[in-house]
Amino acid sequence: MYSYNLNNFQYNNYNTVKTVKATPVENEQPAPQKPSFTSNPIKQVPYNAAFTASNLRTQLVSNDEKAKYNKLTQIADKNTRKNLNILLKTGVLLNSDSNDKSTTLDNLYLIATTQRAQGLDNAVLLHDTVQTLAQPHVVTQQFGNVPKQFMAKTVALGNGEDVNVEHSGTCPAASIEFNLAQKHPAEFARFANGLSSPEMSVKKTIKLSNLADNTLDAVWLLNAFEIPYKADNFNEAELTFAPDKNALVRAYFQTVDRDKLERSSIDVLMQSTFMNVGSQQSYNTLTDKRAGKFNQNPKGLIEFEKTFTESVVEDKNKISVTYQKIDENAKLVGYETDFATMKKQIVDALNMGDNVIIGYTQTDNTNTIVNGHEITIIGARTDKHGKMTFICHDTDDGQSKPVEYSEDFLLPKIHHAGLPQKVAEKDMQVKENWVEGLETYKQLKKQYKNVA
């Protein structure tokens, strides 16, 4: 995991403090859309590395597989049964691209038939997980209101009016969730099973080389982010992913009182877990606020935190490439590279089978950044005039389908992109992310002392 960043200020000034647009929790209509993009009805990305010809299975073979599938169809509602059939025919159900090689079917069976965390419902969890796998574009960051009958008890937890979250800061976590569902369905189902179980946690073995070239530097990162782990050798570590204690409260609300366009219980558990990882185990799901040593803002994740989280969730060496130059007054003053290089790097990553999570900014009439938001680029196409259109998933646009942005609109707004190491190293020198994190930590401590 690396970061390419020549200016510490631009690293600190970008943050998902606010979403670019949000639908109020009482509103069940899609947020108003600007004509900068158009809807795209596609359901799947053309290429997915998890489904190669060598491991694509679309037929139940063993008696165990048949028994599990039959049990699920007995439990499931009509829509879930339909989606299960789609997952089987497309190879998703029997995919075993998970950390422990369990299949999507194995984990869905556990979700449906074994005890869940208190207040969670097996049938609802099965429905939500299957729907997300069949249609990953349903992943959203819209919180939903606290049901009136639970407001007094929720406020008594010490969170007051902060529990009415209208503008979610979970776009980085929601983007990572979408990526996991679309690119690694068996692992998504494994996370859904573990996070909704009585233990409310998932263990995952990762390669330390996907965090840093040097083992000690990788261990520094794990310690800095305070994620529980066990390392018995210099090559791998077993990490424990878990949401904060209040995630179960929100997940219960979304189980019994979920409105249209709001997060599912699975969305809550996934996003709370990934926010907790990125915020150094300091996230509070009830208020959508965090603490942590790398960010002085209580909302969202900064670039460094998002890249760490993405790297450990996918167990891939991600490089955070920063494109925009931001001065100390949060003003956009230029770019680190030209748009042609930016476009080439994104397309190269897509051609490798990766989605690309980007952070983009909005500026006011003085070119000062006022908003930051994370979305996922899942594809691209070029017209006869050579102009490219990017196909994206936005977890905060009030739609359950892809959207399209022209290159002229999107490229100037991209602050950073999470790219595979092989892509970024072709065109630039990279700085390891643990170095970036240490420098930022020292800078924040210095700023705090000056204020104090």
Question: Each predicted region: which residue ranges?
Answer:
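Active-site signature of cysteine proteases
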Residues: N5-P30, I42-Q44, K299, E305-A452
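Low-complexity, intrinsically disordered export/secretion signals at extreme N-termini
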Residues: M1-L110, L126
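Active-site nucleophile-adjacent alpha helix/oxyanion-hole segment immediately C-terminal to the catalytic cysteine
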Residues: E65-D97, K101-P298, I357, Q399
